[in-house]
Amino acid sequence: MPRHIYIATTTDTKGQELAYVSELIQATGLTTVTVDLSTKESQRDSGADICAETVAGYHPDGRQAVFCGDRGQAINAMAIAFERFMVSRVDVAALLGMGGSGGTALITPAMQRLPIGIPKLMVSTMASGDVSGYIGASDIAMMYSVTDIAGLNRISRRVLSNAAHQVAGAVYFAQEASPVDDKPALGLTMFGVTTPCIQAVSAELSDEYDCLVFHATGSGGKAMEKLAESGLLAGVLDLTTTEVCDLLFDGVLACGPERFDAIAHTHIPYVGSCGALDMVNFGSPATIPAKYADRLFYKHNAQVTLMRTTEQENIEMARWIGEKLNRCQGEVRFLIPEGGFSALDAPGQPFWDEKALTAFIRTLEETVIQTDKRRVVHYPFNINDPLFAQAAIENFKEIVNRPSH
């Protein structure tokens, strides 16, 4: 089946731009499908291949939910309709969106629903700030429009031309499936201070598995769990769960409250650990909340400051993680590296704190309801000790090879 590059925007304000980008892409020999997402009902011909009324019809409550007369409600409703519309399409080679704040909020939820690997480019006036809410756990590329998307001029023509040709290039040079794609994929979480562990595990398992390493920056855990939820992972070695620290204690690399939920939903084979639970991440010292002024800090670099978690915070984290693990009915092993949770959390290192470590271990043991499938396992090593990496590998192989009950 032929595939097309979908181009979406609100033609009542960006019709010129839509036509311009479509013509540029078609000039490369590729085909386009233009989509109008205007939220004001109109009798005019938008010039798009798919009119706004057609997209609005995909809303569960029908077109009237979109064409309601309230701009905010209309944008939210059209976002739902467009998401459902795009999910229904089987001929999508790429999706290019153009918009301001409203258009970006309208288009990116649909982009998030498309499979990873399908090119997604959002040209937006919002792309110079925090775009995490627009991207989520997807592989959306954001391009700052520089000027508002309000007509063609010497700047917008250059920016939109770049966008058109970037998407066309991504489609033209799409990577063919390689032999490694035949291997089952594993998700692994890593931080700089747990790198030796994850590298050792990946090296050992790479002959049998395609090892996908996710940087545990908040979005990394979300991306990994999205793949697990989509059935694209054969197992998870979630050895770096540091995102929980930031969620609970105001850090800047926080996961969401849904962390671990995909593991519970999918019953995917899971080996977890305490990687970097000794630290909360902040930006430069000037950005640290005043309530933490008297805490122990480590300057990772000019833009990253790490705060040591306390005994009480370790109790809270262990309880939170333990309650999440109790919801998991698949094969689960949570490994405790008694010699420390990171490169900084080891005897003689800046974050070594036996009381905090003991508090975490004790609370996790008290919280987790252990069964034949759900176990907490202790090892007398630091997380970066090669023997701990080997233990993680052995636990993973054991649960993968266990007969299902």
UniProtKB/Swiss-Prot annotation:
Database matches in CDD domains: Tm-1-like
Q: Which Gene3D superfamilies match?
A: Uncharacterised protein family UPF0261, NC domain, Uncharacterised protein family UPF0261, NN domain
User: What domain of life does the UniProt record list for this protein's source?
Assistant: Bacteria
What family is reported? Belongs to the UPF0261 family.
Classification via HAMAP family: UPF0261
Q: What is this protein called?
A: UPF0261 protein YPO3839/y0391/YP_3209
Native species: Yersinia pestis
